[in-house]
Amino acid sequence: MPVITLPDGSQRHYDHAVSPMDVALDIGPGLAKACIAGRVNGELVDACDLIENDAQLSIITAKDEEGLEIIRHSCAHLLGHAIKQLWPHTKMAIGPVIDNGFYYDVDLDRTLTQEDVEALEKRMHELAEKNYDVIKKKVSWHEARETFANRGESYKVSILDENIAHDDKPGLYFHEEYVDMCRGPHVPNMRFCHHFKLMKTAGAYWRGDSNNKMLQRIYGTAWADKKALNAYLQRLEEAAKRDHRKIGKQLDLYHMQEEAPGMVFWHNDGWTIFRELEVFVRSKLKEYQYQEVKGPFMMDRVLWEKTGHWDNYKDAMFTTSSENREYCIKPMNCPGHVQIFNQGLKSYRDLPLRMAEFGSCHRNEPSGSLHGLMRVRGFTQDDAHIFCTEEQIRDEVNGCIRLVYDMYSTFGFEKIVVKLSTRPEKRIGSDEMWDRAEADLAVALEENNIPFEYQLGEGAFYGPKIEFTLYDCLDRAWQCGTVQLDFSLPSRLSASYVGEDNERKVPVMIHRAILGSMERFIGILTEEFAGFFPTWLAPVQVVIMNITDSQSEYVNELTQKLSNAGIRVKADLRNEKIGFKIREHTLRRVPYMLVCGDKEVESGKVAVRTRRGKDLGSMDVNEVIEKLQQEIRSRSLKQLEE
């Protein structure tokens, strides 16, 4: 007879098997009404699943993260229910949960229009408002296959044939006349699935293979209540205003074009931001004692075969040939850095050796995945590799962690989630090697009192890694930084040093990137600041404007003076009204506008305005220069008088 232990340590004794819903009802009708699922001995189960033995039980509600994920998954099934009613010949493929929502890939003999999506969402609401029960049945593999074969669901049959063992018992979930297959759990009743919205459609190949049929992917978002849904939609609206592609065009930062998909054409102002970011990173490299190097753009395929990249990464690599030799354009910098390390005999006294590069890399990303600066084919990594002894690993990883937090704080990013990615199925190196590498990273994080979670199986094929995900002002996650141990690549490329015992040893290699892709990070910053870059990063920091022609000479003198002081400044001497000039440069997000009239010429001062519309009044020119230099030098996120 099961004894159920609840999270508060209390126990309930039963003389028969019980479900999480039974226990919730036993505790109280309010909890039963809120019960979505249960966690039994750490495993999520449906509210109706029976517990036959002693167990630890937590009741999952919409307030739990798992509860929200279940709601989203059930909304995907609701979408399937609705689309089969509207277009009965639709074939259903897969419908997983994603960040903030769900999607379903469908095979439909018509291209869905916006009107179709609206009709589909309306039908989903009509069905959800019926508050029908979702019925779960565990059936044999053969019964599941027969069920979907009879319904013409060829994609579900394919999943059963290729992904589910014949002795398994798949879970079928019945939404009235509609049936879907899933590991679950799902909501017990559709009253939990009232707060959703369909967002967009896109194309997607079956199983992600371009050789397969193109399906239609329908994206949706779902939340536990109306307030949360509306808040999310408002964040999306704000995100659209901050879209770096839109702002990049408004501020003339860069452009992309069809002749070079995924490659950035940097304009002067955008390249100014890029170079200023490089200056900042270089200052940190000097502070943390890195040396900067530059490797070639492409190397012989033979080298990439030695590293293991060719076997694991060749589909993402661009290749070319010359004089009967095949070359790979580098997708990453690490093999080149090992070649530099290998030049000349190294001693243990030379370690740690910290080698950094602004490496120009190229990856053959699918054209459909390209997205402005966020997903490109040609990008620059703020990449570094540290060669060290095993005894130095902990100190070096600690240094990397400090550098990550040091740099992110400069941009105002405070919420950082850390994950430790462990060995994937497809990997190089021994299990003992992976055990040691994973333990070293975990200990370094623990010593820095940094909370982290494991991502099982998500490491790179050559070593485990720490991933740093920062959250922006809209609470969107951006995975940028990595610190990754590699016990394999140096030995593959014959890297060695002479140890204290005068024997040759293989160094440990630590891969380290903080901003990740410079292009992507500029995209993130553009959206984080909505184009209002902090003064130190702004392409033009000051515009000096005249009111009439009589102040032109004074404006030119001031422009030269500020430029000599290291400030990026422009003069606007156009024969336009001063209000027009101020509005134009405000729209260009120029941090400071200095206005010069006859009064300013006579007094040797300037009238200072910020792009936020704040009038700082008349100020001495030297005082303005001194304050701006301090703001720029300190890389402050705030402007004067803020």
From Swiss-Prot:
Residues 200-219 are annotated as: tRNA acceptor stem binding. GO terms for biological process: negative regulation of translational initiation; regulation of translation; response to antibiotic; threonyl-tRNA aminoacylation; tRNA aminoacylation; tRNA aminoacylation for protein translation. Changing K465A: 35-fold decrease in kcat for Thr activation, 570-fold decrease in kcat of aminoacylation, no change in KM. MRNA binds at residues 246-249, 342-349, 489-503, 547-549, 575-586, 595-600, 609, 615. Its main location: cytoplasm. Its cofactor is Zn(2+). Residues 2-241 are annotated as: N-terminal region which includes the editing domain, important for catalytic efficiency, its loss increases mischarging with L-serine, deacylation of incorrectly charged tRNA no longer occurs, partially complements a deletion strain. Pfam families: HGTP_anticodon, TGS, tRNA-synt_2b, tRNA_SAD. It catalyses: tRNA(Thr) + L-threonine + ATP = L-threonyl-tRNA(Thr) + AMP + diphosphate + H(+). Residues 1-224 are annotated as: Correctly edits mischarged seryl-tRNA(Thr). SMART domains: tRNA_SAD. TRNA(Thr) binds at H309, R325, Y348, R349. Changing H186A: Mischarges tRNA(Thr) with L-serine. TRNA binds at residues 313-317, 363, 375, 462, 484, 547-549, 575-583, 589, 595-600, 609. Binds 1 zinc ion per subunit. It helps recognize and select the amino acid substrate, and thus has neither a purely catalytic or structural role. GO terms for molecular function: aminoacyl-tRNA deacylase activity; aminoacyl-tRNA ligase activity; ATP binding; mRNA 5'-UTR binding; mRNA regulatory element binding translation repressor activity; protein homodimerization activity; RNA binding; threonine-tRNA ligase activity. Inhibited non-competitively by borrelidin (BN, KI is 3.7 nM) which binds in a 1:1 stoichiometry, inhibiting L-thr activation. BN binds to 4 distinct subsites in the protein, preventing binding of all 3 substrates; BN also inhibits human ThrRS, and thus it is not useful as an antibiotic. Changing C334S: Does not complement a deletion strain. A number of inhibitors with high affinity for bacterial ThrRS and less affinity for human ThrRS have been identified that might make good antibiotics. The modification N6-acetyllysine is found at K286. Zn(2+) binds at C334, H385, H511. Catalyzes the attachment of threonine to tRNA(Thr) in a two-step reaction: L-threonine is first activated by ATP to form Thr-AMP and then transferred to the acceptor end of tRNA(Thr). The rate-limiting step is amino acid activation in the presence of tRNA. The 2'-OH of the acceptor base (adenine 76, A76) of tRNA(Thr) and His-309 collaborate to transfer L-Thr to the tRNA; substitution of 2'-OH of A76 with hydrogen or fluorine decreases transfer efficiency 760 and 100-fold respectively. The zinc ion in the active site discriminates against charging of the isosteric amino acid valine. ThrS is also a translational repressor protein, it controls binds its own mRNA in the operator region upstream of the start codon. The mRNA region upstream of the start codon has a tRNA-like secondary structure; mRNA and tRNA compete for binding to ThrRS. ThrRS represses translation by preventing the ribosome from to mRNA, and tRNA(Thr) acts as an antirepressor allowing fine level control of enzyme synthesis. X-ray structures prove that operator mRNA and tRNA bind to overlapping sites in the protein. The protein structure shows 2 N-terminal domains, the central catalytic and C-terminal domain. The C-terminal domain recognizes the anticodon region of the tRNA while the acceptor arm is sandwiched between the N-terminal domains and the catalytic domain. The N-terminal also contributes to the precise recognition of tRNA(Thr). The editing domain encompasses approximately residues 62-224; when it is removed the protein mischarges tRNA(Thr) with L-serine. This is Threonine--tRNA ligase. It comes from Escherichia coli (strain K12).
